[in-house]
Amino acid sequence: DIGLDLNMFGNRMNVVFDWYQRDTKGMLAPGMQLPAVVGASSPFQNTADMRTRGWELAVNWRDRIGKFNYRVGFNLSDSYSEITKYDDNAASKLLSNFYPGQRLGEIWGYEVDGFYTVDDFVDTNSWKLKDGVASIKGVSPRPGDLKFKNLRDDDKSTNQIDSGDGTLDNPGDQKVIGNSLPKYLYGITLGANYKGFDLNIMMQGTGQRDAWIANNLVFPMYIYSVNDIKYQPLFDGLTDYWRPVDAANGDYTAVNPNAKYPRMYGQNPTVGSNYGRKTDKYLSNAAYFRIKNVTLSYTVPKTWISRIGLNQLKGFVSVETVSYTHLTL
């Protein structure tokens, strides 16, 4: 831990900075994998080590102008945690588990490369993709489906998007697209007092945070069963989905090529791999800012209350969560 504490301008300004590193040894994690014949999952053991690094900054200013006193405070911090060791017998390093070098909160997914267009296909009868256009393993894409970037050539060199085997050594075309843990946590405090009145305001927020949310509040007609589609509501803001000019007569040119969402389906919309994969395009912004508290108080002068045997009388009004900027889907 390294710190710096400064007082300046006649102690009106105070600056505190800290940088720290913390090592955690023997974290609980799934231990050595057991043979399949055992019929049980690996027991948790003290098999993982983690290193956390971060910093904190706090700046405070207080002064007075005549009988008016005021104060301003600001704090900012950030940190990350990384797995430095994980003892198990699985050389494959599953992305769903700890692995050395992993940063906690990693979100793995695919990088979107727009939508498939009718020009990506040889014709509209066979729906065969042209040479050089990446296909999707297990899926027959159509115009309006999400297209993904081929980040890694597979062993067959088929220019095909796949998930590999879900390990660090073979993640397919997945990569780290975000992090679910908050970064750049900040707070602001404002205060002032004058002739018995005292005002305090507290604000806080997170500068950066990613979230993957998949439900019918985020995606149009997102369903889990074909039989449920007629019961699915279409919420406000979800109508900007890809549309063809006239699919019934074979015109699959996009009416809105810059649509936010891919084409709709008459069956489960994860067909075509549109919503069944985590993608950078649809990560939600979970950063926020809120005015957490506003408190106004008044202290009655002692000369007014001493006649009734009171030493102090103070009244206040406090409001919680005055303003809030929420999750952006």
Where do the protein language model's features map onto the residues?
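Extracytoplasmic gating/loop element in the C-terminal half of outer-membrane beta-barrel translocons
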Residues: 206-314
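Outer membrane beta-barrel strand-and-loop segments of large Gram-negative receptors
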Residues: 16-65, 99, 103-111, 116, ...
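Short loop/turn motifs that connect adjacent beta-strands in outer-membrane beta-barrel proteins
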Residues: 9-12, 64-70, 83-87, 302-315
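Transmembrane beta-strands of outer-membrane beta-barrel pores
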Residues: 19-25, 61-63, 76-82, 194-196, ...
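Conserved small/polar residues in nucleotide/adenosyl-binding loops
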Residues: 325-329
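Membrane-embedded beta-barrel scaffold of Gram-negative outer-membrane proteins
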Residues: 1-37, 70, 77, 81
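Conserved small-residue
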Residues: 64-178, 218-221, 227-256
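Transmembrane beta-strands of outer-membrane beta-barrel proteins
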Residues: 13-15, 70-72, 188, 194, ...
